[in-house]
Design a protein with these regions (language model features):
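Soluble secreted/lumenal catalytic domains
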Residues: 1-194
Length: 194
């Protein structure tokens, strides 16, 4: 049936956005932006119709969640770093059918997962920053999956990924890329640091 055509661990460092703007950081993240453009190129070459982003800035306290609204559009300001990302425009198509399917198969495999196809919840910057460079023309549909899970078992996260692959390959009529958006480990500089 469906195909998982590409999987990647990617950055979403907010200074990518600052790198576009006039000021002292202009151009400093061009290499990261070029990397995202290459992933975009590879997804298009593979015929990807939907990008599923595991977003490490979407914090949840119970279950796994899939933001699969039919459309995401607005202005985004980061509640974590409003001095880095402020009023960043976004406009992406969603994929409610795939989101509901992913949740259904995950639940069948014992992983409590909720799809949200009729929500006003906007994606977080772990989704929006990469899509700013990979989906400039609304070519792809986009899903966002909560990946900052405060009370989850690591083994359940692995099983969730396995269930998503089964859903895509066994039941979905299309081609998907999965992106793990976020650092494996990082720390922000302390206040008063130089």
């Amino acid at each position: 049936m469906g195909q998982l055509a590409l999987a990647a661990k990617i950055t979403h460092v907010p200074s990518m956005y600052l790198s576009e703007l006039d000021g002292p950081r202009k151009g400093t993240r061009q290499d990261a932006i070029e990397g995202h453009l290459e992933i975009d190129r590879r997804c298009r070459a593979a015929g990807v119709d939907t990008i599923v982003v595991f977003d490490t800035h979407w914090l949840v306290n119970a279950n796994y969640h899939i933001n699969c609204a039919p459309h995401f559009k607005g202005l985004y300001t980061s509640n974590e770093l409003p001095h880095f990302i402020s009023n960043m425009a976004y406009d992406h198509r969603g994929n409610p059918d795939l989101g509901v399917l992913l949740a259904k198969v995950a639940n069948e495999h014992g992983i409590a997962t909720l799809a949200h196809p009729a929500t006003t919840l906007p994606p977080e910057y772990g989704t929006l920053v990469p899509m700013r460079y990979m989906d400039t023309d609304k070519h792809f549909k986009v899903l966002s999956v909560s990946a900052l899970c405060t009370v989850h078992y690591l083994s359940d996260s692995a099983r969730l990924g396995w269930a998503f692959r089964r859903a895509i390959e066994d039941h979905y009529d299309g081609t998907v890329a999965i992106l793990a958006s976020g650092s494996l480990s990082h720390r922000f500089a302390q206040n008063r640091s130089t």
